Amino acid sequence: MDNKKIIYVDIDGTICENRDDLRQEPGKENAEYEDCKPYYDRIQIINDLYDQGHEIVYWTARGVYSGVDYTELTQRQLNEWKVKHSQLKVGGKPHFDMYICDKSYNAASFFHAKSRGLP
């Protein structure tokens, strides 16, 4: 592929349920990352980008506040969910409420778009 892109993808709330959102549901106040169900339709879209030759890096903020190393769990989930990727980065990601950047996509907008042209 001549126009290979490096694409960073978040995990929670992007390719699987968000643990913090799950905790808002009655009876799920103690939900953990293990309880998050994958969004297979979204995973397939990113897998297609990988198959097209793009480099896919999954980067998660899991453990940023708690200091817990979620690398093993997260890699196991990616394997079980058949997520194709070049690299996994766990931690080291800043926590923020909003990210403004000329190269970012909102997950909902990206996955629900009729056309997904890459820049």
Question: Where are the regions that the model predicts?
Answer:
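Catalytic phosphate/metal-binding cores of nucleic-acid and nucleotide-processing enzymes, i.e., regions
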Residues: M1-P119
